[in-house]
């Protein structure tokens, strides 16, 4: 079924593999117009969001993603992203807060995550353990949040993260406050790369002088708690790695 094939591949992979179209390596994985279109005025559009309050979204559940220093590409520096998941199946995700942790020791990075658990009703923490400080941060975080999930980045898993995020953007299911301008830069820094074997994967491009791709990967590690295909039944990940 052609629709199933499209769901299982990014638009560029579909064009490259099934339509015999050439896809240029190094292009941004996410359309700038789509990214800008996901931005909203949080103060007007999110009545439950009080960013300077002790509990910015009250008791609403949130999912947190953490991207470790340097592990998801060549230009990352580590970041945490806080996302409010939809309250109903198929609803919208909202990135309500982000923080970059560049220059912090792994104990301090884990402390940043712990501080978020004091301010938010955290249901999920996805942690990149591929490299950098990730494994050490995970070992600390699981002491105060035993349900934290470690994710190992591979060619396939990064593709899954990007596919999920593209799906959310296409369906209008992801929003961020326009004040979070670095998020646009972060997602625009995620580039498609073709391996020697012809497999398309994704990395952050440091050669272009961008070091904020970490915010994008952290956001994707939060939203992937709703796996591809799980948007209609509220299904969430229960596996420890992917």
Regions picked out by a protein language model, each given a short descriptive name:
Residues 1-155, 159, 163, 173-242:
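RNase H-like, metal-dependent nuclease domains and their acidic two-metal-ion catalytic environment used
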């Amino acid at each position: 079924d052609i629709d199933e094939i499209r769901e299982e591949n990014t638009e560029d992979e579909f064009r490259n593999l099934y339509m015999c179209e050439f896809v240029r390596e190094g292009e941004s994985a996410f359309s700038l117009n789509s990214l800008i279109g996901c931005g909203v005025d949080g103060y007007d559009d999110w009545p439950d969001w009080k960013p300077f309050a002790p509990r910015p979204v009250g008791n609403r559940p949130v999912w947190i993603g953490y991207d470790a220093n340097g592990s998801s590409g060549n230009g990352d520096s580590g970041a945490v992203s806080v996302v409010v998941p939809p309250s109903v199946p198929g609803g919208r995700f909202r990135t309500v807060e982000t923080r970059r942790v560049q220059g912090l020791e792994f104990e301090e990075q884990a402390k940043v995550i712990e501080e978020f658990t004091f301010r938010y009703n955290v249901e999920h923490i996805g942690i990149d353990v591929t490299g950098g400080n990730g494994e050490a941060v995970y070992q600390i975080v699981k002491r105060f949040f035993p349900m934290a999930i470690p994710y190992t980045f591979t060619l396939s898993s990064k593709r899954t993260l990007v596919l999920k995020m593209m799906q959310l953007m296409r369906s209008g299911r992801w929003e961020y406050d326009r004040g979070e301008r670095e998020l646009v830069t972060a997602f625009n820094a995620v580039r498609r790369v073709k391996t020697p074997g012809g497999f398309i994967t994704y990395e952050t491009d440091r050669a272009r002088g961008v070091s904020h791709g970490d915010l994008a990967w952290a956001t994707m590690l939060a939203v992937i708690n709703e796996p591809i295909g799980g948007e209609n039944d509220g299904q969430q990940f229960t596996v420890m790695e992917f």
